Amino acid sequence: MKNSVHVSKTEYHVDRENKVVLCTLYVDTQLPKHPAWVSISQDFFAKRFPFISYGGEFIVKAKARCNKEDEFDEVVGKRIAESRAKVKAFSIAARMWECITRAMNAFALQCNTTMVACAKAEIIEREHVKELCK
């Protein structure tokens, strides 16, 4: 299954002295490209995720810390930090989509309730017309 999460930029900060690698990912969920974009409002997720922009962009950071007894390997540290940052990014994106889904389901339920009410009113009015035409 394909997701719409795209990492537009990756930055690393390596601290050899403390054996730490920090990875920063610039993430784009590409909301404007989604088929439901015309129905999506930032209000659906802004309260829970204020750091996500209107278009679905956000930044995540993660670090990899080497054990003091182990030998520091920058390449492995970068891979671990990037992987941890991606876990955060996909977690945030999934929870953002969950907020959007809940909001849209609530709207669909309200639309369905209104539809049922209109259908009932139509039946009542049809019966009223029949009675008036007798």
Range-by-range predicted roles:
Residues 1-134:
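Catalytic phosphate/metal-binding cores of nucleic-acid and nucleotide-processing enzymes, i.e., regions
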